[in-house]
Amino acid sequence: MERGNRKTRIGRVVSDKMDKTIVVAVETKVRHPLYGKTVNKTTKFKAHDEKNEAKLNDRVQIMETRPLSKDKRWRLVEIVEKAK
């Protein structure tokens, strides 16, 4: 299902309370520009989950897509790991 240069991210589901929408927190390591320390930066994305299959704390893969609402520009591709 390759669609050109669409970005993909892997993150954890931090909210599944909305219908057909999940909030995914993606953590990246960034070096501080002045001090050089590696800092964890968390970005939250709202993603479309058509079947409401992702649950809280699942590891999921999301892919960039067309704008689906005011905040949603990502969609669920697969659940990498179910929450324990």
From Swiss-Prot:
SUPFAM superfamilies, A to Z: Nucleic acid-binding proteins
Function: One of the primary rRNA binding proteins, it binds specifically to the 5'-end of 16S ribosomal RNA.
Top-level taxon of origin: Bacteria
Subunit structure: Part of the 30S ribosomal subunit.
Protein family (similarity comment): Belongs to the universal ribosomal protein uS17 family.
NCBIfam families, A to Z: PRK05610.1, uS17_bact
Molecular function per GO: rRNA binding; structural constituent of ribosome
The UniProt record lists the keyword Metal-binding: no
Keywords, ordered alphabetically: Ribonucleoprotein, Ribosomal protein, RNA-binding, rRNA-binding
This protein's name: Small ribosomal subunit protein uS17
HAMAP family named among the record's database cross-references: Ribosomal_uS17_B
GO biological process, one term: translation
N-terminal signal peptide: none
GO cellular component, one term: cytosolic small ribosomal subunit
UniProt source species: Clostridium acetobutylicum (strain ATCC 824 / DSM 792 / JCM 1419 / IAM 19013 / LMG 5710 / NBRC 13948 / NRRL B-527 / VKM B-1787 / 2291 / W)
Keyword Transmembrane helix assigned: no
